[in-house]
Amino acid sequence: MFARLPLYLRLVRMDKPIGSLLLLWPTLNALWIASDGHPTWPLLVIFTVGTVLMRSAGCAINDYADRDFDRYVKRTENRPITSGKIKAWEAVALAAALSLLAFLLILPLNTLTKELSVAALFVAGSYPFTKRFFAIPQAYLGIAFGFGIPMAFAAIQGHVPLLAWVMLLANVFWSVAYDTEYAMVDRDDDIKIGIRTSALTFGRFDVAAIMICYAATLGIYVGIGVLLGFGVLYWLGWAAAAGCAIYHYTLIRNRERMACFAAFRHNNWLGGALFVGIAAHYAAGSF
């Protein structure tokens, strides 16, 4: 069992934390806004650890679902299931165990949060299969990656206000932007194997679509900032995030594979900038 631990860690991408961070930033935004800048330490631990666990479970399910496709994609041909180092049933069992651990974490929270977690599990588990049917599965991914937002509001406020759903919508636009950059890396392979992605759906308008999605994300956060009366520290964070989006354009405009992948990874800084702006605003108001 312990000898196989490195394989399991590779399966759930513990060596690639970018995915967990892309889930974590929107969740932290929600925790700070829902609590007026004062989330409790237990909630921070529950949602942070839960985010890592569910992202890991999602990776295991994704590799299970894509096991017959990954062998034809250069970037994924050596993944543990595809290479035969881990059996398919092991990935399913690991995903189930991680999901159970994540659910156990939220047992102290209210009923609404638990109910939302069931919906979150369904969306996360079904996402990998949407690549067979949906023209833009990245939008579905945005819902999966953003479910921590309504759950955070439910845990703190006991209900899910309209603001939470607006923040989730912003996350959908952001996910379409960064995961289209990711899909541009595999475009040629995806055409061969018949996987549907936003990069293929947008075609020659892929770069324009990405920038429109960034603009929509940032535009929604302008509305949030105005609605909540955020101060200059928030807007500095917002400006840094906008600068990241502009930088991404310089990376993706020529559609070079590694540059597109670099843009995808750089979204950690965009998400982090928005969170720092939100947290700084509330912190400044505490003094």
UniProtKB/Swiss-Prot annotation:
Keywords: Cell inner membrane, Cell membrane, Magnesium, Membrane, Transferase, Transmembrane, Transmembrane helix, Ubiquinone biosynthesis
Catalytic activity entry: all-trans-octaprenyl diphosphate + 4-hydroxybenzoate = 4-hydroxy-3-(all-trans-octaprenyl)benzoate + diphosphate
GO cellular component: plasma membrane
Molecular-function GO term, any one: 4-hydroxybenzoate polyprenyltransferase activity
Domain of life of the native organism: Bacteria
UniProt-annotated location(s): Cell inner membrane
Topology term for the membrane: Multi-pass membrane protein
Pfam families: UbiA
Cofactor (UniProt): Mg(2+)
Enzyme kind, highest EC tier: transferase
Pathway(s) where this gene product acts: Cofactor biosynthesis; ubiquinone biosynthesis
GO BP annotation list: ubiquinone biosynthetic process
Transmembrane segments: 30-50, 89-109, 133-153, 158-178, 199-221, 267-287
EC number: 2.5.1.39
Family label: Belongs to the UbiA prenyltransferase family.
Function of the protein: Catalyzes the prenylation of para-hydroxybenzoate (PHB) with an all-trans polyprenyl group. Mediates the second step in the final reaction sequence of ubiquinone-8 (UQ-8) biosynthesis, which is the condensation of the polyisoprenoid side chain with PHB, generating the first membrane-bound Q intermediate 3-octaprenyl-4-hydroxybenzoate.
The protein's name in its UniProt record: 4-hydroxybenzoate octaprenyltransferase
UniProt source species: Paraburkholderia phytofirmans (strain DSM 17436 / LMG 22146 / PsJN)
